[in-house]
């Protein structure tokens, strides 16, 4: 009895020690949260606010994230088979709210979809109201880019939804090849993918491309009431025009945003608006199109856009100086009829400099209070490439209550990394996703970071 009593005492003492440790850790996190400010990493997510995931002991890059109704995160990107860049697959991972992989999804939280013999890159993801996951991108033969739109739908458990397209996969072929960069849902459940279509492809030279949109019925079949058999393409000035983002307005109109170029101003921000049947809306901009130059023969490209409740469109991307020495985050805001909004930074556009070369914003988010979050990174040209975030006030000035002077830089280590996508949680926190190189094998992993935002 004395031995049993002694063991029970040791157990009770050990239990009290564990309980005390748990209380201390809880108090530590609580104090951290109480002292935290908007833009700080969220210590309740992953390790100190960061998560890295090796999907295949190869090169993995996360491109986009979507939030489920239950708070879980769906992250999509590409993974290379044995680091063979001609054999990329769609990769999807789902995370619990604390940043751990959700083992109820796919195999230990991960799904891989192969397109045999093709380089396949998913660019965007959206969650349907029924929990199904729609991923859009492209698949092509390496160095030819003679590929197609690929739209894949997964069941909530990560299996392919065989009621959609051909075994869960829809392939849309445009002339000369195409690629989807974004996807969105209409209120009626129809799916719109947007990207680029090659009109004339010249390897090693400047190609002729147009904005490309495709709309699908709920089962993945083309919507014949949209454009020409479910497809629309739009030319700006006969050169390289690419749509990177697509929005649906409450009135059913569709806005595509990206870049267009000509010999005079080189690449500019570009936007086009369509009626619900896919025809150009001539009440927007000039003949349904808008171009915005950030000065001289710059390389300016919009990568993401968001729609304000008042109908104004915010676009973000990058602007490169004429001599190529500096590339900054670039943001433009348009009125509902496609004119630069002069109440935003006096001329409708602004740039954000993080102090090093070659920064690009890849995602824009709108807070409920009207403030603007831009997320991105550098272009892999130095070991100083990090996740970059900035917050703007409604009129375009940096919000100095966010991070340091309105800007946040997050490093995962001394090697290259950057953010490609972001989303808000229901509590306002920001989740950014991208990639991070590792010392272990010099390849890259999915990288996630979560930030506090009181909005």
Regions found by a protein language model. Give the residues of each.
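N-terminal secretory signal peptides that target proteins for export/translocation
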Residues: 1-14
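Extracytoplasmic mature domains of secreted or surface-exposed proteins
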Residues: 2-3, 17-18, 27-455
């Amino acid at each position: 009895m004395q031995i049993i009593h002694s063991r029970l005492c040791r157990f009770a003492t050990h239990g009290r020690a564990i309980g005390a440790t748990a209380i201390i850790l809880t108090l530590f996190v609580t104090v951290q949260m109480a002292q935290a400010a908007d833009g700080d990493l969220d210590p309740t997510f992953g390790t100190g606010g960061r998560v890295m995931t090796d999907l295949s002991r190869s090169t993995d890059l996360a491109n986009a994230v979507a939030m489920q109704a239950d708070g879980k995160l769906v992250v999509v990107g590409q993974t290379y088979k044995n680091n063979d860049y001609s054999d990329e697959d769609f990769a999807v991972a789902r995370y619990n709210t604390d940043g751990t992989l959700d083992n109820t999804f796919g195999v230990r939280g991960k799904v891989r979809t192969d397109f045999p013999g093709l380089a396949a890159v998913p660019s965007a993801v959206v969650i349907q109201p029924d929990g199904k996951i729609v991923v859009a991108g492209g698949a092509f033969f390496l160095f030819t880019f003679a590929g197609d739109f690929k739209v894949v739908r997964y069941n909530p458990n990560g299996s392919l939804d065989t009621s959609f397209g051909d075994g869960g996969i829809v392939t849309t072929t445009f002339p000369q090849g195409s690629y989807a960069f974004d996807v969105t849902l209409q209120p009626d459940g129809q799916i719109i993918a947007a990207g680029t279509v090659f009109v004339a492809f010249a390897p090693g030279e400047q190609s002729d491309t147009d904005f490309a949109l495709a709309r699908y019925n709920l089962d993945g079949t083309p919507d014949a009431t949209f454009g020409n058999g479910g497809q629309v393409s739009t030319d700006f000035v006969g050169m390289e025009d690419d749509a990177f983002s697509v929005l649906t307005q409450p009135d059913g109109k569709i806005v595509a945003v990206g870049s267009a170029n000509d010999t005079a101003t080189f690449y500019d921000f570009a936007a086009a608006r369509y009626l619900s049947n896919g025809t150009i809306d001539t009440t927007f901009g000039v003949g349904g199109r808008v171009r915005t130059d950030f000065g001289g023969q710059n390389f300016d490209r919009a990568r993401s856009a968001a729609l304000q409740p008042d109908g104004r469109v915010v676009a973000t991307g990058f602007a490169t100086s004429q001599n190529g020495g500096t590339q900054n985050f670039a943001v433009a805001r348009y009125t509902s009829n496609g004119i630069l909004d002069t109440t935003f930074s006096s001329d409708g556009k602004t740039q954000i400099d993080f102090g090093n070369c070659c920064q690009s914003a890849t995602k824009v988010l709108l807070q409920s209070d009207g403030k603007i979050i831009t997320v991105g990174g550098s272009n892999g040209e130095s070991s100083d490439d990090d996740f970059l975030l900035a917050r703007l006030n409604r009129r375009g000035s940096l919000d100095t209550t966010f991070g340091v002077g309105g800007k946040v830089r997050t490093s995962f280590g001394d090697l290259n990394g950057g953010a490609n996508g972001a989303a808000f949680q229901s509590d306002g926190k920001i989740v950014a996703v991208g990639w991070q190189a590792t010392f272990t094998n010099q390849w890259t992993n999915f990288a996630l970071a979560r930030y506090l935002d009181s909005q």
